[in-house]
Amino acid sequence: GKDAAIFEGDNIQTSERSFVIITFVDGTKITIRPNSNFTVSQFSNEDGKKTAKLALHKGGIRASSGDIADSSPDDFQITTPTTTIKAQQADYSVRVCEGAQCQQEDDKLKKGAITPAHDVIARVVEIKGDVSAVSGEDLSQESRPLSLGAPLYSTDVLKSDVNGFAVIVFKDKGRITLQEDASFAISEYRLNETGKQDKAFFKLIEGGMRVLTGTIGKENNDDYEVDTLVATIGIRGTGFDLVQQSTGLSSKVWLGTIAQTNEAGTTEISAVTSNHIKDKFSKPTPIKDDDNAFATAAPRPDLVKVPNEPELFKTMPLDLSKPGTYVDVHDGHVRVQGSDGIYLDLGKNESSYTNEAGMSVRLEAPPKFMAQDPYPLPSEGFSENLAELGAYSLLNEDYALTASGQVFQCECAQ
């Protein structure tokens, strides 16, 4: 019943008319859907030994990650018959579909295709040390630590520590390396949005960044710019380094041309040329290409090899006729690894399918049976919408809803 303890090794099975929400001691929360089979294979919340291995054999779950996954995603995993799932600061859903089960469920739901989401605009392809991001729409929220494959979004503000850097690839094939002890903002980024002009606007807040431009800005230079404290940088098909210090802005062009605009006018410099601008009222003065301002261990982004780069944002149409594992991410970063050993990274509003052979693909849009799931994300708790969607009729008294509508929960021990 309510508040019952669950232990390492326990197996939980739900019937056709039941579901349960579980809370683990590290803060992980999982909703186990009807007709599911779930095992707590391994769980430890002890310092130095934190690890969790959970298994979904059948059915589905909806999960919100806790401290173990958030601090070390590799130490928290959920396996299905074909997939291993690791999450970081994420809300996500997992379904194991057998035969035509999910196709039949999908057919019963409201007609109409789910609109594909375009939230993820870049991914981390190389990282060292501590690098974090926070949405510029709410700088008061907790920053999220970035890891290899982490998704990035328009308005994100990134920051690296003194020993950290990150190389980022954007959907238009542009790249940026955020150097050590630096910060920059993705002020606005749009690509292939119906009725809107493509745009890539960035802001260097402090420290250094190394930039390789992509397709945005090639046809219209005004579609791409980097704002700094002392000048706005426009591009002409370009690779360049910028370093913002208390003494001003140092710029080095190693490919193409940039235009520097401030109160003193506009100056164009081409590869291979470097200069320094003291403040927004000053014209640039030449400096050596090996000036100390450009010293960094962070690589030029064009020199970083990215395995399977065409797959970073590639999506496939949905085909529900075959069995396999579906993952739908509502927030955060989830990494899916099929039994073929290949990773697939998912961000907010992205979903994937892994077939019985263990091959994973990113989907153009989530299936309706996941997007319209009436069972609650555990981070949201029980919702009255559950009753409106008919879920009351699915619940068994063994997992009783009280008159106030609270769902049975477990505090899960080690």
Residue ranges and their predicted role:
Residues 40-41, 63-64:
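Signal-peptide-cleaved, periplasmic/extracellular N-terminal interaction regions immediately downstream
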Residues 61-63, 209-214, 258-259, 334-337:
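Hydrophobic lipid-interacting interfaces of membrane-associated proteins
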Residues 1-3, 7-8, 15-33, 45-53, ...:
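C-terminal interaction modules
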